[in-house]
Amino acid sequence: PRLRRQRQMCIRDRYLDYMFIEIMKSIENNFDDPKVNELLNKHFIELRSVSPEGSSHVLDIPGLKDPSIRFWSLWEEEELIGCGALKTLEPNHGEFKSIRVADKFRKQKIGQKIVSHLIDRSKQLGFKKLSIETGSGEFFAPARKLFTSFGFETCRPFAHYKEDINSCYYSLNL
């Protein structure tokens, strides 16, 4: 797996009362890690439980190992904080998949870190457009709010997706 470190320094005030250094590491395609497997399995079970049959597009681990998909787990120190994947639909068009925040880190803006990381990686890979499919139910409202906060706009179904009352589709031009 490839490792990438991001560093961010936050200074409380101009007198330097204290300095907080946050180190987040990103590991690509580490499906052998038990913590990653546990998080993904929980993600699959939960999404399949809230989506009607035929409307769930969540990928299992073998699905995420497809050569068209790049998967990252994000860590702070030795704790898994979340994950996300990027699927190549066309040479300049990618789709976000399997975005998940570990339960312990919910409501701490980790979803924003994951989406930011995926957008940054998408730009590095030369994508010009990103898309995502998510659920239309109340359970998915936080995800929809997160994506629109990054400028994603509703769009028609893309790639293999079809109109579905249980799905919402979004895209972002980079």
Question: Locations of the language-model features?
Answer:
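Single conserved hydrophobic/aromatic residue that forms the stacking wall/gate
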Residues: P1-D13
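Acetyl-CoA-dependent GNAT
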Residues: S26-H93, K97, A102, R121, ...
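Alpha-helical elements of Rossmann-like donor-binding domains used by nucleotide-donor carbohydrate transfer enzymes
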Residues: E38-K42, K113, H117, Y169
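Short hydrophobic/aromatic beta-strand or adjacent loop that forms the aromatic wall/cage
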Residues: I69, I165-Y169
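Conserved acetyl-CoA-binding loop-helix of GNAT-fold acetyltransferases
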Residues: V101, K107-D120, K145-S149
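Conserved active-site alpha-helix within GNAT-family acetyltransferase domains
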Residues: Q112, G137-R156, E163-I165
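Conserved GNAT acetyl-CoA-binding A-motif
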Residues: S122-G135
